[in-house]
């Protein structure tokens, strides 16, 4: 009996973790478009994947805007006359992009499309897709700006501001 019981106890201890399953969420993003394009994120003409928003004080309502472009790498895509940029992040709120991974409280990121069909359109939870172009003139670079902004009704405290969002560009 002891010979049978010992292996059973050992196997139960070793494999007990396999019975409890973890769940999670996977986000998918893509685009169906008339032209496939390589897109770079540029700040001041330099390719960057991180937008440095600088600093603001707890007395400030907003930080300075930092302009950045989504830049197509082919002439065919630079000549497109209409398109859409879709943004995806678990951090989008009604006012912008939450400080998802930073330590500061009461601050979010205001993300604004500059040369969109409706100029200076903010990207929020309720508006994650932005249209560009008039169907006649070339769009060129897709221009955006971002800044830190104090969240209404919350106390702004010192700390870091770190968040992320994914984009997809679809030309029509």
Describe these PLM feature segments.
Residues 16-18:
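N-terminal signal peptide c-region/cleavage motif recognized by signal peptidases
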Residues 20-172:
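Mature extracellular/passenger domains of Gram-negative fimbrial/pilin and adhesin proteins
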């Amino acid at each position: 009996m002891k010979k049978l019981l010992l292996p059973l106890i050992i196997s139960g201890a070793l494999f007990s973790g396999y019975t409890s399953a973890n769940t999670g969420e996977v986000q998918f993003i893509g685009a169906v478009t008339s032209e496939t394009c390589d897109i770079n994120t540029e700040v001041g003409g330099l390719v960057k994947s991180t937008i440095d928003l600088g600093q603001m004080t707890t007395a400030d309502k907003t930080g300075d805007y930092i302009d950045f472009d989504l830049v197509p790498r082919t002439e065919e895509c630079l000549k497109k006359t209409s398109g859409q940029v879709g943004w995806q992040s678990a951090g989008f709120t009604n006012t912008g992009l939450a400080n998802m991974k930073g330590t500061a409280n009461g601050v979010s990121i205001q993300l604004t499309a500059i040369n969109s069909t409706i100029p200076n359109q903010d990207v929020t939870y309720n508006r994650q897709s932005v249209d560009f172009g008039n169907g006649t003139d070339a769009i060129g670079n897709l221009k955006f700006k971002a800044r830190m902004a104090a969240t209404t009704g919350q106390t702004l405290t010192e700390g870091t501001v770190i968040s992320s969002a994914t984009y997809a560009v679809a030309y029509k």
